[in-house]
Amino acid sequence: MSVVVYAPASIGNVSVGFDVLGAAVSPIDGTLLGDRVLVELGSEAFTLATAGSFVDKLPENPKDNIVYDCWCVFSRELNKKNVALKNVHMILEKNMPIGSGLGSSACSIVAALDALNQFHDNPLNDVELLALMGEMEGQISGGIHYDNVAPCYLGGLQLMVEELGIISQEVPCFDEWYWVMAYPGIKVSTAEAREILPSQYRRQDVIAHGRNLAGFIHACYSKQPELAAKMIKDVVAEPYRERLLPNFAKAREYAASAGALTTGISGSGPTLFSICTDKDVADRVSRWLQENYVQNNEGFVHVCRLDKQGSQVTGSKL
């Protein structure tokens, strides 16, 4: 018996909701923009193999891989429930560039924990599993946060609430939106991107941030796509992180001139997203970004839609 789980890319923050909003996305051409993890019965307690486009970026020692840490915390939780742990052999297919702003670590974490849970007949519920995912994300970035793991696991646009035992809740979004995702092929570490942020903010920025986020959520629920797009502005991180992203300002300017509704930084970058309502506009923006924002052959551009499913079992073989 074996199981394979695919976990999609995600946009942390979605510009307007620093650390509290996240959206899962998938290319419209069917490309799997995300990681896959296979779990099968093993001869030892834990073994790990790696594969995929970005396998050379992973640590050589399996015990330095986040998938091993996922297995450790999953084992811990099963032990608490007195559920027997099976010997597992796992394969991580690493298709997501590391430090890309596409929720790369979240993809590996979500795929690994979801696959382990599926393989053991789902002893952990969604909230328990999501809590572990946040714990693992915190191990990498230095603080527990859910804005990538929640949409990656649950799908859609997720708002982190973290009250009453609820970690996140889905916010209705707009099916007609195309999300053009452009990764230039360079790395920006989440830790570095956090270090350049100020420790205190001016009152007017706090007010603007509250207005933008409240306005965006209201527009999503009241089905006002133009207003929602107008509210996607970042006063918390983008003004400080722009300098880490070569050509970001030019890309945003071009996208606006081509008809995109808004452009922002995905997570801590360097990936950007542009939202368009017209497929021709999305294709035009995509072509420009491919020629002017992508810097090497590791970079890519995809026209995406919101991925409403999140992580999913794709079969029993990679």
Swiss-Prot record:
Keywords: Amino-acid biosynthesis, ATP-binding, Cytoplasm, Kinase, Nucleotide-binding, Threonine biosynthesis, Transferase. Pathway: Amino-acid biosynthesis; L-threonine biosynthesis; L-threonine from L-aspartate: step 4/5. Coiled coil: none annotated. One of its GO terms (biological process) is threonine biosynthetic process. It comes from the Bacteria. This is Homoserine kinase. Belongs to the GHMP kinase family. Homoserine kinase subfamily. PROSITE patterns: GHMP_KINASES_ATP (PS00627). GO terms for cellular component: cytoplasm. The lineage of its organism: Bacteria, Pseudomonadati, Pseudomonadota, Gammaproteobacteria, Vibrionales. Signal peptide: none annotated. InterPro entries: GHMP_kinase_C_dom (IPR013750), GHMP_kinase_C_sf (IPR036554), GHMP_kinase_N_dom (IPR006204), GHMP_knse_ATP-bd_CS (IPR006203), Homoserine_kinase (IPR000870), Ribosomal_Su5_D2-typ_SF (IPR020568), Ribsml_uS5_D2-typ_fold_subgr (IPR014721). Its EC number is 2.7.1.39. Pfam families: GHMP_kinases_C, GHMP_kinases_N. Gene3D superfamilies: 3.30.230.10, GHMP kinase, C-terminal domain. Catalyzes the ATP-dependent phosphorylation of L-homoserine to L-homoserine phosphate. It catalyses: L-homoserine + ATP = O-phospho-L-homoserine + ADP + H(+). HAMAP family: Homoser_kinase. ATP binds at residues 97-107. It comes from Aliivibrio fischeri (strain MJ11). It is found in: Cytoplasm. PANTHER family: HOMOSERINE KINASE, HOMOSERINE/4-DIPHOSPHOCYTIDYL-2-C-METHYL-D-ERYTHRITOL KINASE. GO terms for molecular function: ATP binding; homoserine kinase activity.
